[in-house]
Regions:
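Glycine-rich, Arg-bearing micro-motifs that act as flexible, cationic patches
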Residues: 106-131
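Short beta->alpha linker loops
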Residues: 66, 86-90, 112, 143
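A short acidic, glycine-rich active-site loop
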Residues: 52-66
Length: 143
């Protein structure tokens, strides 16, 4: 296993996934890319973990920065090389596309990222990936 793609959104679930992916990366000497997907959905903005600004772009930027900061706080102490990539679109589709482009051997995601309402309306990224991805997917539970 040489390349791992990690889905991050700044949630506790994605940080738990980052811990597991980081340790796996260190143990295997693999390459790790943390991918944050900007997904514009009104319900997502209403449930954002940051103060919602009147400008959706500003809100998306704040969410992206939170994801970047929390991921760095988790991965940097492991002293592994990693990079952060931002994409826009459907999170499951974009994570699969990023993995395909990088010829990743594994996609790692947290089991929870959305609120209950968001999961009902948008579906679970981890569920969609496990059913449709063309490569192995590791879903890390929030403990």
């Amino acid at each position: 296993m040489q390349r791992i793609v990690l889905g991050v959104d700044g949630s506790d679930g994605s940080i738990q996934a980052a811990r597991v992916a980081g340790r796996l990366t260190a143990d295997l000497g693999a390459e790790l890319t943390a991918v944050h997907v900007r997904h514009v959905a009104p319900i997502a903005l209403s449930a954002a973990p940051v103060a919602v600004a009147s400008d959706p772009e500003e809100t998306l930027g704040a969410i992206e920065e939170l994801a970047r900061k929390r991921t760095a706080q988790t991965l940097d102490p492991l002293n592994i090389p990693w990079r952060f990539q931002v994409r826009a679109g459907d999170p499951a589709a974009e994570l699969e596309q990023a993995a395909a482009e990088q010829r990743a051997d594994l996609i790692v995601v947290g089991s929870q990222g959305h609120t209950v309402v968001e999961r009902l309306l948008l579906g679970s990224v981890s569920t969609r990936l496990t059913h449709h991805a063309q490569r192995p997917v590791m879903v890390v539970p929030l403990t």
